[in-house]
Amino acid sequence: DVYKRQQKNSVLVIEGIHALNPELTSMIEDCYKYRIYVSVLTSISLDNHNWIPTTDNRLLRRIIRDYRFRGYSARDTIARWPSVRRGEDKWIFPYQENADAMFNSAMLYELAALRKEAEPILGEVRECDPENAEAYRLLRFLRYFNYIPDVGLPGTSLLREFLGGGSFRY
């Protein structure tokens, strides 16, 4: 219905994790679509043999965002992560190749900037929690990176979506 009310030569932006799903935009002809896929595509390694998994970047972002803005603990987010991954495999990744353009939102300094925020959140996971092994693994992983103070990050940085202090209001 929104599409039918659009003015001639206007732009309709559909944003979100399901925006590339063809069922969502079936009423719009493909020739009128320009699809952009934005994702963390980590391209750095710890050494010649150990690449940083994209999922670690994404999980750390989510742990921080869920804690700061949704009131979830790291334990809660880690416990939900397998379900999130199954949902991605079913509803997001199959459609990423439909994109006309891909944007890699990973930044070389990201893990150093996230470390200061992530460590105390991950440290709240108790040893007796089943999620402790994953929290401990992430804490050890973060030790590879020096801290970068977030005060130097501009308000328009994508990392502000997770760390807070951004220029945009959601």
Located regions from the model:
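Short, small-residue-biased leader/transition segments that mark boundaries at the very start
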Residues: 2-3
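A generic fold-level signal
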Residues: 6-7, 30
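Loop/turn-to-beta-strand initiation segments
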Residues: 8-12, 34
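N-terminal Rossmann-like NAD(P) cofactor-binding module of classical short-chain dehydrogenase/reductase
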Residues: 13-14, 103
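Short beta->alpha connector loops
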Residues: 17-20
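Conserved NTP phosphate-binding and transfer environment spanning the P-loop NTPase/kinase superfamily
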Residues: 22-170
